[in-house]
């Protein structure tokens, strides 16, 4: 189950990977749409939304290839929870313009997040770095 809008709809600017995690936590604390298990998606989940046969527009008016059921005028990419092995300063992002995944430094602020949740029960996940850090405040 995907959130209908992405982080750009809320903030009106790009966010880094840590802010994406904080955004997710804040929605879970508020029980957004009645659920408290929202999370960043995997790369495969991000790919599952992409199709060249689908068309919508991002915040800049560029064509993105996701279903029109999702709110238009959002970001053109999404952070995933996938961290680069042996180089944890990078996380994987997925582009809804090109359909490509790529590594991006976690501090990059020209990014967005589309949150997802499982329809069934799942094991609680908390990234290792989160256990000893505070929430990022802008």
Where are these regions (language model features)?
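Extracellular adhesion/carbohydrate-recognition regions
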Residues: 1-38, 112-116, 123-138
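A sequence-level detector of short linear motifs
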Residues: 2-4, 65, 103
């Amino acid at each position: 189950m995907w959130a209908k809008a992405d982080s750009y709809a809320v903030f009106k600017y790009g966010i880094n990977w840590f802010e994406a995690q904080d955004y997710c936590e804040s929605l879970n604390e508020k029980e957004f749409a009645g659920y408290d298990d929202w999370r960043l998606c995997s790369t495969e989940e991000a790919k599952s939304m992409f199709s060249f046969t689908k068309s919508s527009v991002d915040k800049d008016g560029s064509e993105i290839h996701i279903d029109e059921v999702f709110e238009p005028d959002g970001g053109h990419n999404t952070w995933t929870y996938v961290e680069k092995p042996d180089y944890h300063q990078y996380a994987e992002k997925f582009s809804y313009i090109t359909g490509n995944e790529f590594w991006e430094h976690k501090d990059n602020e020209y990014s967005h997040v589309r949150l997802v949740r499982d329809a069934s029960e799942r094991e609680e996940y908390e990234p290792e770095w989160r256990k000893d850090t505070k929430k990022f405040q802008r």
